[in-house]
Amino acid sequence: MLEGSNGKLLVYASRFMLDRKRLESVSVAAEKMAASLNLNFEVVTFGEKTSPIYVYYKKGEEEPIPLYCDKGGKVNMQDVCAALRNMMFVLSFHPKFLALKQMRREIMQFS
């Protein structure tokens, strides 16, 4: 699949993150959604010592769109899946994201 065809989900997290379980829950949920929608998936680490984990949708060279932010605490993979599904569904109505509009049914089936 070409990188820019349908877009990709990006998980941004600090490389200094101490709670690997949080990162795993968020990244597994994002990877699962990416696979179900035929999107690319990537985990991006950065050097700042911050605890939030972010998930973005990126289409081609356009600015990434934030979908999810985990600021700490308990992370339930099902809650992350639901949040990603809801945000992707909302984005599917934006005229800029026609590829998501065509995937709306798959987005709503994701859980």
List the model feature ranges, each with a label:
Residues 1-37:
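Local sequence-structure signature of Cys/Sec-based thiol-disulfide redox active-site neighborhoods
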Residues 1-9, 94-111:
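Cysteine/selenocysteine-centered motifs that mediate thiol-based redox chemistry or coordinate metal-sulfur cofactors
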Residues 2-5, 45, 58, 70-71:
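Intrinsically disordered, low-complexity segments enriched in small/polar residues
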Residues 4, 39-41, 69, 86:
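Generic detector of low-complexity/intrinsically disordered segments
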Residues 9-11, 30, 41, 53-57, ...:
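Hydrophobic beta-strand residues in large extracellular and virion-surface proteins
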Residues 28, 44-46, 108-110:
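Auxiliary Fe-S-binding modules of radical SAM enzymes
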Residues 39, 43-63:
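Short, intrinsically disordered low-complexity segments
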Residues 58-104:
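Non-catalytic, surface beta->alpha helical segment in thiol-disulfide oxidoreductase systems
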